[in-house]
Amino acid sequence: VSASSSAWSFPDRYDAEIKQAAERWLPGYDWRLWKAQLYQESLLNPDAVSPVGARGIAQFMPGTWLEVSRQLGYQNLSPHMAEPAIIAGAYYQGRQVRMWSAPRPDSDRYSLGAASYNAGAGNVLASQRVCGGANGYAEIIACLPRVTGDHATETKTYVQRIWRYWTEMLLGVK
């Protein structure tokens, strides 16, 4: 068996749904960026449950799932149902990205959106205020420990891994 044929790759089971959701709710971004975020969230596992209670492929906390479900008109759907959760997560991430509307690079906008998805938009906005209104992702994330303490490391790693997984997907590394 050659190394290339035995190499692990990112699961492609939900690629069509991820691509469709990203094109609708994250226009202008490569759909694999949303796939990388879902991979970071749950390893693309719709049955995933985090130690703090986040659920499904997009790792929704119960209150956020109820809010987003209501906004999308979902009734009696579970965050463990892959397709609706992929759509709802892309919708929610798109909302986080659009919140960071000041002129800045698209990569910073996505990173700030992902940090908001992970740590809560209020915490990332507070970090921006603590940093004197900083605009760039690197500057804002550097102040996050002053807002969330040790949890800031988790958020910084979360965003770094999304970009790493996306790069690996593009290069076919993993």
What are these model-predicted stretches?
Residues S42, P62, P84:
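Acidic/His-rich structured neighborhood in mature extracellular/periplasmic domains
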Residues V1-E17, L66-Y91, R95-K174:
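Non-catalytic cell-wall polysaccharide-engagement segments
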Residues R13-W25, A48-V49:
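Peri-catalytic and regulatory segments of divalent metal-dependent proteins
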Residues R13, Y29-W34, Y39, V52-R55, ...:
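Extracytoplasmic
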Residues E41-V49:
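Conserved alpha-helical segments that form or flank metal/cofactor-binding pockets of metalloenzymes
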Residues K35-Y39, A58-P62, A115, Q160, ...:
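Generic alpha-helical structural context detector
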Residues A22-W31, A102:
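Short, charged helix-capping/linker segments at alpha-helix termini
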Residues A48-S69, G132-A134:
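Short, surface-exposed glycine/acidic/tryptophan-bearing loops
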